[in-house]
Amino acid sequence: MSAEVETSEGVDEPEEKNFGENHIRMADLSELLKEGTKEAHDRAENTKFVKDFLKGNIKKEIFKLATTALYFTYSALEEEMDRNKDHPAFAPLYFPMELHRKEALTKDMEYFFGENWEEQVQCSEAAQKYVERIHYIGQNEPELLVAHAYTRYMGDLSGGQVLKKVAQRALKLPSTGEGTQFYLFENVDNAQQFKQFYRARMNALDLNLKTKERIVEEANKAFEYNMQIFSELDQAGSAPASETVEDRIPVHDGKGDVRKCPYYAAGQVNGALEGSSCPFRAAMAVLRKPSLQLVLAAAVALAAGLLAWYYM
């Protein structure tokens, strides 16, 4: 009976098997991410910062502050990864020994700023928005955390190595790794093999198609946060000489737990922190007046993350 049905439908067993395998491959999360973020890649491809960084057009002070932006980003990301290390939608991707960057970034911060570096650094508002988004996802929609982990770490294992060499050459940093510990993955012997292993783990996550589509959407959102940094930089660069960047761009002070801020708590209700700035941040901007280099730093740091995708 079953043989007659297969014949009448015109589909034999080998063809049906091939169709099933092709369908599974097309539904793999890694493939969906690759295709679903292609437009974002194309838009980022022409970013001036990407081209300048590859040419080695970066000053040491900007690179120092770019490291600061990375520190805040990875501190948030790894805090949420630790929080969700047992969550079924993320546990298979939890590799703190191999991937976590906070400790390495701490060494870089000490190299650039000295032992009291924590007293000297803060995060621009545009970069802080991404940090807040990561915290929101980790606490409320952990199934989407893979979008941020995959975007960052897979890029770091790829193009990050190119950026390390560019930075060492352009800034005359020690070849022994001081100032570029962020790019050194001591517990990953073969980056290409590890990336393949990570993608396989990601594809094996028990997720329905709707959740996978949401993950792709979240990855694109991460790119948009990067673009907001570039937009902020454009506005700062076009500000009249009489108008300081600090007057145009409020910042968060980067200390304490931002999630205790009443404005942040209210934003959590809506699922995102967008729109007007926190009044506290605006006040802090007036009182503390961070330098233009801080804004540039955050832009370079996130541009580096975008560039890393092109070498995956």
UniProtKB/Swiss-Prot annotation:
It is found in: Microsome; Endoplasmic reticulum. Its EC number is 1.14.14.18. HRM repeats lie at residues 260-265, 277-282. Heme b binds at residue 41. GO terms for cellular component: endoplasmic reticulum. It is an enzyme of class 1 (oxidoreductase). One of its GO terms (biological process) is response to oxidative stress. It catalyses: heme b + 3 reduced [NADPH--hemoprotein reductase] + 3 O2 = biliverdin IXalpha + CO + Fe(2+) + 3 oxidized [NADPH--hemoprotein reductase] + 3 H2O + H(+). S-nitrosylated by BLVRB. GO terms for molecular function: heme binding; heme oxygenase (decyclizing) activity; metal ion binding. This is Heme oxygenase 2. It comes from Oryctolagus cuniculus (Rabbit).
